[in-house]
Amino acid sequence: MRHGKTGRKLGRTSSHRTAMLRNMVTSFLRYESVKTTDTRAKELRKLAEKMITLGKRGDVHARRQALAVVRDRAVVTKIFNELAERYRDRPGGYTRIIKAGYREGDSAPISIIECVRDISGTQSK
């Protein structure tokens, strides 16, 4: 039975999946937007939100936990200084996934995952 086994396998071994998600979260936090498949974006969102929440904690242990995943000091500094300050008053939901059609080669559904810019919580029309 598959009780308590959350997360998607993404057709990869566990080490390949972990490495891919680490690289993707590093790129996502550096550029604040990534174009990828729907399922990868959904897995990436979990990890990215956790990293930003660690940045909001701001202590040394949180910084070390973030470095264990991201492994790029410049990106970790950005998380703890810029992103943590931007989302200080926001209790989660730092990212959004926008459907972007289908990839030409294999018709895989493509999405753009990006950081939410509007921090007020209201939509502007």
Curated annotation (Swiss-Prot):
Species this protein is from: Syntrophus aciditrophicus (strain SB)
Entry superkingdom: Bacteria
One GO location term (cellular component): cytosolic large ribosomal subunit
Presence of keyword Ribosomal protein: yes
Any single Pfam family the record assigns to this protein: Ribosomal_L17
Similarity section: Belongs to the bacterial ribosomal protein bL17 family.
GO terms of molecular function: structural constituent of ribosome
Classification via NCBIfam families: L17 (TIGR00059)
Protein name according to UniProt: Large ribosomal subunit protein bL17
Keywords: Ribonucleoprotein, Ribosomal protein
GO BP field: translation
Gene: rplQ
Subunit note: Part of the 50S ribosomal subunit. Contacts protein L32.
Record InterPro entries: Ribosomal_bL17, Ribosomal_bL17_sf
